[in-house]
């Protein structure tokens, strides 16, 4: 029921240009997500309260700033609108609340938080973009990559990975590139595969992989998904990054280099996750024809690659 309300709120936002409608849909979105977080554990109640307080504060800031901007058209209020949305997205330096609630989130609620819940704030950023925020987006992407290296909980690593990818998406939005929609969709498909596998394997910490017996098919799918998220060729994540670089070529060269460096750092902590997988059931070859034939993620990668080539070439 709640997921349908969230979907409707997103569809209404897609068809609106009014800041008031955006604000109203964000509130509906927030109130619909809170019951999804609830699994009747004390940790979850604390997380729900934290989420509610942060989202209420950012929504209030957005409402007041938008109202004042519509009256006085001052740059200060325009910047505050952007800041309020960045708080909702959990971009650095406003990411602390995401880390606080991450441990108590279920994999299902984490998936929604990292994908669907970002759509309305990103639509608002597209309407109220301040180009002065671009350096913040880029530094947020870099810092998220660096900070992820000290964490060992998979949910926290995925959150920092999401923040890093958000930096790319926000830069695409800042440059008025509609490719950000495709980037978000491809990222959502990849992260869906990873989170579903983590849930099936009950994978919460990096050390868990060395203690669990994992089926070859599941291991293979996880490796493919992580390599795609890392942007390794020939997976769809690589072409996603290449297309983003192509569209951002006109941006400041230093900024572009920082984004690429952040992706290379991301590759390091993705490899931290992948390394144990390569040594589980080592007799299994991930490139064997039978396993490739049955592997869902390979089919998805091939399909998305064909679609991407047809769209852009």
Curated annotation (Swiss-Prot):
It comes from the Eukaryota. GO terms for biological process: mitochondrial electron transport, NADH to ubiquinone. The chain crosses the membrane at residues 3-23, 47-67, 81-101, 105-125, 128-148, 153-173, 177-197, 220-240, 253-275, 293-313. Its EC number is 7.1.1.2. Keywords: Electron transport, Membrane, Mitochondrion, Mitochondrion inner membrane, NAD, Respiratory chain, Translocase, Transmembrane, Transmembrane helix, Transport, Ubiquinone. It is a multi-pass membrane protein. It catalyses: a ubiquinone + NADH + 5 H(+)(in) = a ubiquinol + NAD(+) + 4 H(+)(out). It is an enzyme of class 7 (translocase). GO terms for molecular function: NADH dehydrogenase (ubiquinone) activity. InterPro entries: Complex_I_Subunit_2, NADH_UbQ_OxRdtase_chain2, ND/Mrp_TM. It is found in: Mitochondrion inner membrane. Belongs to the complex I subunit 2 family. Core subunit of the mitochondrial membrane respiratory chain NADH dehydrogenase (Complex I) that is believed to belong to the minimal assembly required for catalysis. Complex I functions in the transfer of electrons from NADH to the respiratory chain. The immediate electron acceptor for the enzyme is believed to be ubiquinone. This is NADH-ubiquinone oxidoreductase chain 2. It comes from Rhipicephalus sanguineus. The lineage of its organism: Eukaryota, Metazoa, Ecdysozoa, Arthropoda, Chelicerata.
């Amino acid at each position: 029921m709640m997921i349908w309300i969230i979907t409707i709120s997103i569809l209404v936002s897609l068809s609106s240009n009014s800041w008031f409608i955006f604000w109203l849909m964000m509130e509906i979105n927030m109130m619909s997500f809170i019951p999804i977080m609830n699994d009747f554990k004390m940790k979850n109640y604390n997380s729900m309260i934290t989420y509610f307080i942060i989202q209420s504060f950012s929504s209030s800031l957005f409402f007041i700033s938008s109202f004042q901007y519509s009256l006085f058209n001052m740059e200060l209020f325009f910047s505050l609108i952007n800041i309020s949305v960045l708080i909702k997205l959990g971009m650095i330096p406003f990411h602390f609340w995401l880390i606080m609630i991450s441990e108590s989130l279920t994999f299902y609620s984490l998936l929604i938080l990292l994908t669907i819940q970002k759509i309305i704030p990103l639509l608002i950023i597209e309407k109220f973009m301040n180009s002065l925020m671009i350096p913040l987006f880029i530094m947020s992407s870099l810092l998220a990559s660096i900070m992820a290296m000290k964490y060992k909980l998979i949910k926290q690593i995925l959150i920092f990975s999401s923040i890093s990818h958000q930096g790319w998406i926000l830069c695409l939005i800042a440059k008025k590139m509609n490719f950000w929609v495709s980037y978000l969709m491809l990222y959502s498909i990849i992260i869906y595969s990873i989170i579903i596998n983590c849930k099936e394997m009950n994978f919460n910490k990096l050390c868990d992989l060395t203690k669990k017996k994992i089926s070859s098919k599941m291991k293979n799918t996880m490796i493919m998904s992580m390599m795609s998220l890392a942007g390794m060729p020939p997976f769809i994540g690589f072409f996603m990054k290449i297309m983003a670089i192509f569209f951002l070529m006109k941006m400041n060269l230093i900024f572009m280099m920082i984004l690429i460096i952040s992706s290379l750092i991301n590759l390091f902590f993705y490899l931290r996750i992948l390394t144990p997988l390569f040594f589980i059931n080592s007799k299994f070859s991930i490139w064997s024809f039978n396993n490739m034939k049955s592997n869902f993620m390979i089919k998805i990668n091939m399909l998305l690659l064909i679609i991407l080539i047809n769209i852009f070439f």
